[in-house]
From Swiss-Prot:
Protein task: Induces neurite outgrowth in specific adult neurons in vitro.
Family annotation (InterPro entries): EGF-like_dom
Gene3D superfamilies: Laminin
Listed name of the protein: Epidermal growth factor
Modified residues (Pyrrolidone carboxylic acid): Q22
Keywords associated with the record: Disulfide bond, EGF-like domain, Growth factor, Pyrrolidone carboxylic acid, Secreted, Signal
Signal peptide positions on this chain: 1-21
Domain EGF-like: 25-61
Coiled coil (residue ranges): none
Pfam family of the protein (one): EGF
Main location as per UniProt: secreted
Amino acid sequence: MMRHLLLVGAAILIFVSDAQAQGDGEDPCQIVRCSYGANCIAYGDTAICECPFGYSGIRCQDPS
């Protein structure tokens, strides 16, 4: 799984996952579940988790 780290503002880390929807119009945020109240943003067929301050990881699962 390929990961890219983007720094947005001073406190929000966004991890881009290459999780792909199944091609049937399924929302990728239904496949990739973000943790700790992180927001999931569907960008095409890719899910992006916007981690709250203090969390990191593809799905914001790691306290930082």
